Curated annotation (Swiss-Prot):
A biological process from GO: mRNA catabolic process
Stated name of the protein: RNA pyrophosphohydrolase
Phylogenetic lineage: Bacteria, Pseudomonadati, Pseudomonadota, Betaproteobacteria, Burkholderiales
Listed EC numbers: 3.6.1.-
Species this protein is from: Janthinobacterium sp. (strain Marseille) (Minibacterium massiliensis)
SUPFAM superfamilies, A to Z: Nudix
Key word Membrane present: no
UniProt record similarity statement: Belongs to the Nudix hydrolase family. RppH subfamily.
Cofactor section: a divalent metal cation
Function (record text): Accelerates the degradation of transcripts by removing pyrophosphate from the 5'-end of triphosphorylated RNA, leading to a more labile monophosphorylated state that can stimulate subsequent ribonuclease cleavage.
């Protein structure tokens, strides 16, 4: 379902914990991190789509989260042609998204990345609200920045946008094995046999 301009209606989810840290998911078999997101099906409201995507991609249900805020309007990004399937090139331009800020009221162990046959993420972690976005695929960075900025007004304590240092992004990309011994792990993964 595309709008007249070629944008697919979509929802994006910024999930925070009680420390205002943001949930990041690592894309399956990739080295990029992103927030949960997904298309709005015909007849769904953005809120219904958000809850469906949250359960499909993260394994959390409505009782695990509280809606803190949402963007006032659609935020758009265009997808480069080489990422678009040949059969829809010329019609499809990108995504237009309503972004939701959710506070997790459940527990970390409620997260289940294997709710579907084809999971989106193979690892996840909490990270500071403001983090360098170079771990996000380039064409989504601007919309992420705009969503984080707009929704930051809903945070329970003010967070000041301090330009992050480069080592913060490296930490987000580090795997469990590459951590320093005294550094706590915040990455959540499941063993392959589950």
């Amino acid at each position: 379902m595309l709008d007249r301009e070629g944008f697919r209606p979509n929802v994006g989810i910024i999930l925070i914990n009680t420390r205002n840290e943001v949930w990041w998911g690592k894309r399956v078999r990739e080295h990029s991190w992103q927030f949960p997101q997904g298309g709005i099906k015909f007849g769904e409201t953005p809120e219904q789509a958000m809850y469906r995507e949250l359960e499909e991609e993260v394994g959390l249900r409505a009782e695990h989260v509280k809606i803190i805020g949402r963007t006032r309007d659609w935020l758009r990004y265009e997808v480069p042609d080489h990422f678009i399937k040949r059969e829809i090139r010329g019609h499809y331009k990108g995504q237009k998204q309503i972004w939701f800020l959710l506070r997790m009221v459940g527990r970390d162990c409620d997260v289940n990345l294997r709710m579907t046959e084809h999971p989106e993420f193979d690892a996840w972690r909490w990270h500071d609200y403001w983090v360098p976005l170079d771990v996000v695929i380039e064409f989504k960075r601007d919309v992420y920045q705009r969503a984080l900025q707009e929704l930051s007004r809903f945070l329970s304590r003010p967070t000041q946008h301090v330009p992050p240092q480069h080592n913060t992004a490296r930490y987000l990309r580090q795997t469990h094995a590459s951590r320093k011994p005294d550094e706590p792990s915040t990455e959540k993964t499941k063993p392959d046999n589950e």
